[in-house]
Amino acid sequence: MKLSKAIDIFFKCAQVIDEEVCSLLSSYVATLRALYLLHQNHHWEAEDYQHHLLFQRLYESVQASADAAAERVVGLCGKLNDVDMYKLVESFEGDEFVESSLAAEEEFQKLAKTIYAKIKEKKCIDIGA
């Protein structure tokens, strides 16, 4: 993609990024951070080595995604809205580590789809769907 086209797309997107989208994007980052904490807690509390490694890989991959997403959201919105990620962690917690992590990941996917639909509705992006 030519630089001029990329700049045009950026400015088009910047014009449609409103408070609603910024709030959704802040929730996205908060949910990533909550997933990080959840997976890290499960990593520490895992009773067997396989689960210990699984949750370590999960929290390490989520950490990189959360950092990249937060930087982009701050670039678009100027700041992250306050979202209580600790309440999110509590809402994801369960007795079974694997099941609660899967449920949290499913909730994250739903949020990501909601954000994508909202941004697509504003005709800012389209990745062929």
Residue ranges and their predicted role:
Residues A34-R57, T114-I127:
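Helix-loop segments that flank and shape redox-cofactor active sites
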Residues Y49-V83:
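Conserved alpha-helical segments that form or flank metal/cofactor-binding pockets of metalloenzymes
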